[in-house]
């Protein structure tokens, strides 16, 4: 049998601020190398808000990321937007909402450029939705429709909602 193993970025290197899931800013290449050597062929990239435009996905050098993935024979299948947990759109004023919307659109466009098709939005833990937040979350996501269609990127929602509320 030929299995294609995948992992979430950062699992093969040191914890960041004692968190198991965080973008490994200083060790992202090492993380890919270790994953490749251990038979992993798929990765879900992680994006935190801190220095988000300095990550290889969003900076002008996303060719660096593309080349590293190619060299390691690893396919980036998704991006987890952990920055959502650090900057909740439904708790923003209009300026903050526009800034976050720009970040999300930039992420989607760069995902498209690299052929990554799934953006995971975490609505769990710190970013869990209250009933009152649902309309704001729907409104925020609705404004991404054109960008998503044009880029062929889909959103996957990680949620702690009861199934009947999803």
What are these regions (language model features)?
Residues 1-106, 112:
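N-terminal pre-domain/capping segments
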């Amino acid at each position: 049998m030929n299995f294609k193993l995948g992992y979430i970025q950062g699992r093969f290197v040191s914890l960041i601020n004692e968190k198991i899931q965080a973008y490994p800013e200083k060790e992202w290449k090492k993380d890919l190398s270790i994953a490749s050597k251990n038979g992993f062929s798929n990765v879900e990239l992680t994006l935190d808000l801190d220095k988000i435009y300095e990550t290889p996905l969003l900076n002008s050098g996303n060719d660096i990321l593309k080349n590293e993935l190619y060299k390691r024979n690893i396919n980036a299948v998704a991006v987890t937007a952990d920055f959502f947990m650090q900057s909740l759109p439904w708790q923003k004023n209009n300026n903050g909402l526009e800034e976050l919307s720009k970040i999300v659109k930039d992420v989607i466009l760069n995902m498209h450029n690299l052929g990554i098709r799934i953006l995971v939005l975490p609505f769990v833990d710190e970013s869990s939705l209250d009933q009152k937040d649902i309309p704001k979350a729907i409104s925020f996501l609705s404004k991404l429709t054109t960008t998503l269609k044009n880029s062929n990127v889909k959103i996957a929602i990680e949620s702690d909602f009861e199934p009947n509320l999803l």
